[in-house]
Amino acid sequence: MRDEIFKEPISKQFEFDDFVASVFDDMISRSVPFYDVSSNLNAKLLAKILPKSAKVCDLGCSTANSLLLLNNLRNDLVLSGVDNSEAMLANAKNKAKAYGASINFILADITECELAGFDAVLANYTLQFIRPPKRADLVQKIYNGLNENGVFLFSEKIIFEDKKLTKSVIEIYEDYKQAQGYSRYEIAQKREALENVLVPYTEEENRNLALNAGFKRVESTFKWGNFMSFLAFK
């Protein structure tokens, strides 16, 4: 379905409810620049570096896009997805069934669920929705739950230290969204709905989240304007 949620006036903050879940794949593909390109790149990188029969967990898996890409590249991987939206997981299960993918889906709050014994943890555009006081604790839990030499792949919307640069990049990004078919009204509506719900960090703050948790190094695998993917190594 096409994302037209913000064509009408909104009266609440953004949340991953049934309406968002029903249009999520269209929403993210038109809202995150080069989403398909970056998702495929990150999946291929993981497919190359993960050991045989590696255990992978996607936190905030939404409709399982990343997990399905991995399953297509490596059918030996043991895949799990965690999300707190029943509607998202319902769509994820339907897609996994359609593609014949064996994925364990878990309905849970990612800040409270147990994480242990994984070779890779994914969090694509997920940390930005975790309240800042809980974010460092979650990344620490991810680090603790990874096996030796495990990796943490996460993608985030970012801001810059320079406020003028941030403003300019956001303007370019909103032009991009308009080119994807969103009206200026829809863009403004969503921006308002996301206020204080999506809290972005700078590139340095995101790197430090991982480094302070104990990761040895953090590489960047993709970047466009204010969107970025990181790969942290335990």
Curated annotation (Swiss-Prot):
CDD domains noted in UniProt: AdoMet_MTases
Region forming the signal peptide: none
GO molecular-function terms, A-Z: carboxyl- or carbamoyltransferase activity; S-adenosyl-L-methionine binding
Family label: Belongs to the class I-like SAM-binding methyltransferase superfamily. Cx-SAM synthase family.
Function according to Swiss-Prot or TrEMBL: Catalyzes the conversion of S-adenosyl-L-methionine (SAM) to carboxy-S-adenosyl-L-methionine (Cx-SAM).
PANTHER family: CARBOXY-S-ADENOSYL-L-METHIONINE SYNTHASE (PTHR43861:SF2), TRANS-ACONITATE 2-METHYLTRANSFERASE-RELATED (PTHR43861)
Name listed for the protein in its UniProt record: Carboxy-S-adenosyl-L-methionine synthase
Gene: cmoA
